[in-house]
Amino acid sequence: MDVSYLLDSLNDKQREAVAAPRSNLLVLAGAGSCKTRVLVHRIAWLMSVENCSPYSIMAVTFTNKAAAEMRHRIGQLMGTSQGGMWVGTFHGLAHRLLRAHHMDANLPQDFQILDSEDQLRLLKRLIKAMNLDEKQWPPRQAMWYINSQKDEGLRPHHIQSYGNPVEQTWQKVYQAYQEACDRAGLVDFAELLLRAHELWLNKPHILQHYRERFTNILVDEFQDTNNIQYAWIRLLAGDTGKVMIVGDDDQSIYGWRGAQVENIQRFLNDFPGAETIRLEQNYRSTSNILSAANALIENNNGRLGKKLWTDGADGEPISLYCAFNELDEARFVVNRIKTWQDNGGALAECAILYRSNAQSRVLEEALLQASMPYRIYGGMRFFERQEIKDALSYLRLIANRNDDAAFERVVNTPTRGIGDRTLDVVRQTSRDRQLTLWQACRELLQEKALAGRAASALQRFMELIDALAQETADMPLHVQTDRVIKDSGLRTMYEQEKGEKGQTRIENLEELVTATRQFSYNEEDEDLMPLQAFLSHAALEAGEGQADTWQDAVQLMTLHSAKGLEFPQVFIVGMEEGMFPSQMSLDEGGRLEEERRLAYVGVTRAMQKLTLTYAETRRLYGKEVYHRPSRFIGELPEECVEEVRLRATVSRPVSHQRMGTPMVENDSGYKLGQRVRHAKFGEGTIVNMEGSGEHSRLQVAFQGQGIKWLVAAYARLESV
């Protein structure tokens, strides 16, 4: 049989994985190693050479897009029908299983799937029915708790509360939620997998049927599986099924949502004798970029081990730029992209990656000022985000009580006991009397036309808005914004959201405070008060709209969103301690290695050109913060990195000290060797200077604080 069409396009290790005997197999697939091709060719090999029926094959991926691509590529390669083969996501395959056996799974034939929004709405209703205070028992936290328990395979009766009243209450919420779903014939996404797992445990004859059918199981992105997903695959395989898993322990970056990188090691323990094949040849990046990625990830412990390499060129060194602040960082990135475009490159070939969504605001503004179209991948523009629109609506209502849209958005956000029935009365009164909603509330309260509890809640809300308006009227804009976010209850509400999403919302609110501070410094309008001017600015920016999907545009995204993508030119911004690695990872033990894996993912997105940037000072939470450069910069080989200077580019030893040619004369008014005092760092000596005018920078050796580069215009140094 001629199998050249299956093997000729592959390298040696890929061929080894595709043509391996039918046995349990771990393929450690490095970034850019064409693992999808290997999976597709392996499936084709099983059918063509091993004579396996498509009916015996189950292939599991993590996204519907990946599943569709796999089906398409198998069809192209084989040219025959793959009828009977199951290819899909964990949730999709579990859904298919439950539809086929709904009675055995104790589900109605027409059971419906709850999306996240529906799940949240149901939990809000249940928490209210249980007479629980939403502020103390937030529905979003309840959703996180329930989904986390299901991902661990736990029902309410499995949970050990050990007399903990908080745990007991969440357990009751979970129980009430489960009963409500069962009555209505509803399943959420986490329930799909848990119910499918329980189906096999409780109905051995059904499990045996699928074990006999799916004797060839292939799972992609195995490092991203959680406990219930692993248990599902382990149960299906039994003692006779042949499992091929493809994964990369160095790219496990979803621990915050339950992914267990340890599942790769569990596979080796549970399937003794499983062969391991490493795909290390990279078809994406230059040799310099791969050398940096290898050196970075080697600082993690407990790796299964692999080293990426390429037949391609060495390529350019990685560029490293130290910005004065986040504004300078954004300008530098935009200027680099403009140069790329001027040299014939497409904007869509450039990606800006950041650790936190909050970092996008300054970048978005710089791109807008440069009239450069951009697209937020997998997310929304800064001023379109829920928490930002909530905060802006409070500010709008303070500026104008008759803003009905703002009133509607925040009257019950956070929840304050103003029900839909009360709001319907307010709306009807507004329509009948041709009043704004605020005016309608005033009249209804004066007329005592509302029920006692509703009237009290509405009265408190209006008093809150009036008090905020009066007490913050003379405050600087950023102080006013910070006060409104706190006193409105928004900050507390979002702090109660568990996990990465809640943290992101808080960071975005803090970035809004920073935005108002910078606006009050940089924007002047004689005809408007600062708050009104900023609200106009925010509305105009939100109205700009993202670039159309067909339009050539710069790509902005978080590092998590970038996984699986590649771009000719990549910028990773905010490479500072406390930013990346994040402060949360530094505060919580055991998370630093996942941050390093995230950095590794970011570095390996770059095909030709990679630029890393960090800022000496950055406005965070409305304050100027000094961060050290990220430890990840110091872990890169010095021969792979080149530091970008204002006037020249020089090779850089990789350390947190900066090298340069001393300038004896400088128009900043400072001199080499001069003793100075800084408000935060204390006394020090000027050891180097560069730039001129507003870009003049000083390198100062501080006692006990190390060497710092400071912008002369902002440093406020005193001579000693």
Regions found by a protein language model. Give the residues of each.
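Short glycine-/polar-rich loops that comprise or flank the Walker A/P-loop
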Residues: 23, 52-56, 81-84, 239-242, ...
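Conserved helicase C-terminal RecA-like lobe
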Residues: 159, 163, 346, 360-372, ...
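Conserved P-loop NTPase-based nucleic-acid remodeling module centered on helicase motor cores
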Residues: 56-145, 150, 157-162, 321, ...
